[in-house]
Amino acid sequence: MKQTVYTASPESQQIHVWSLNHEGTLTLVQVVDVPGQVQPMVVSPDKRYLYVGVRPEFRVLAYRIAPDDGALTFAAESALPGSPTHISTDHHGRFVFVGSYNAGNVSVTRLQDGLPVELVDVVEGLDGCHSANITPDNRTLWVPALKQDRICLFTLSDDGHLVAQEPAEVNTVEGAGPRHMVFHPNRQYAYCVNELNSSVDVWQLKNPHGEIECVQTLDMMPADFSDTRWAADIHITPDGRHLYACDRTASLITVFSVSEDGSVLSVEGFQPTEAQPRGFNIDNSGKYLIAAGQKSHHIAVYEITGTQGLLTEKGRYAVGQGPMWVVVNAY
């Protein structure tokens, strides 16, 4: 299995392309100059394209991924109705979802042969919209509205339109600020990191109709932490055994173990990391975690070790200015 790591640095308007080997070493393959401040990125389900959101001219760009080394070639672009904060796709590669924090909306762009061709839907009124997350069955889009302390639930129609479910939303505790999410591989649980109180909620998917319930909320900060809480990102290993979330003020990654059924999280430890970790990701083998320091202008590679999933630093690498996003592609 070959793996490529992509890092987005908006201040220098660059994407760095890295080869990741089995020992956790990165080798630089390419530096792409992007026409704008590049932030969110996602790889298409078929591994052939990288979709990125840029500003101040709000667009989604599509880059072809070379099958031999992961290098990027620009392919297409499509306009967006707001500054892109988060980008994702449905599991069949038919649509791109973009959440916009500043515009307070989520948009759906249709893909044709892997390329973005037209905007098909926009839902407004999502104050502080910070991500858009399709359920494993490709039926329901979960959209955290950070400033409203709610997660809105939409059914994805065959033509890409979003229809509010019943109930149309669930609420977090006041002041939590739901931000980013991941789903457990067993498809029965989801985990949402809350930016403003640096906690993680465990949501149970109770039935195929989209009904969900919060079954656990866990503080992700050390007991003696007294500064402003500012959580950012969350990811789970492919086997569902370990979960990680980061806080930018503390510049740390919290390590969680996940119960066998996915319903219970336990804090296993805290890993100091690059200054102001805005984004990170886990490789497809579940062996390495790559974190980006927005203030250090570096990324760090960690090996995931032992039954607790604790992190051991393998190396750090200079990237562009203000790195914010990391994605990993395997082929």
From Swiss-Prot:
<dbReference type="InterPro" id="IPR022528">
    <property type="entry name" value="6-phosphogluconolactonase_YbhE"/>
</dbReference>
<dbReference type="InterPro" id="IPR019405">
    <property type="entry name" value="Lactonase_7-beta_prop"/>
</dbReference>
<dbReference type="Pfam" id="PF10282">
    <property type="entry name" value="Lactonase"/>
</dbReference>
<dbReference type="GO" id="GO:0009051">
    <property type="term" value="P:pentose-phosphate shunt, oxidative branch"/>
</dbReference>
<dbReference type="GO" id="GO:0005829">
    <property type="term" value="C:cytosol"/>
</dbReference>
<dbReference type="GO" id="GO:0017057">
    <property type="term" value="F:6-phosphogluconolactonase activity"/>
</dbReference>
<comment type="similarity">
    <text>Belongs to the cycloisomerase 2 family.</text>
</comment>
<dbReference type="InterPro" id="IPR011045">
    <property type="entry name" value="N2O_reductase_N"/>
</dbReference>
<dbReference type="InterPro" id="IPR050282">
    <property type="entry name" value="Cycloisomerase_2"/>
</dbReference>
<keyword id="KW-0313">Glucose metabolism</keyword>
<dbReference type="InterPro" id="IPR015943">
    <property type="entry name" value="WD40/YVTN_repeat-like_dom_sf"/>
</dbReference>
<keyword id="KW-0378">Hydrolase</keyword>
<comment type="function">
    <text>Catalyzes the hydrolysis of 6-phosphogluconolactone to 6-phosphogluconate.</text>
</comment>
<dbReference type="GO" id="GO:0006006">
    <property type="term" value="P:glucose metabolic process"/>
</dbReference>
<protein>
    <recommendedName>
        <fullName>6-phosphogluconolactonase</fullName>
        <ecNumber>3.1.1.31</ecNumber>
    </recommendedName>
</protein>
<comment type="pathway">
    <text>Carbohydrate degradation; pentose phosphate pathway; D-ribulose 5-phosphate from D-glucose 6-phosphate (oxidative stage): step 2/3.</text>
</comment>
<keyword id="KW-0119">Carbohydrate metabolism</keyword>
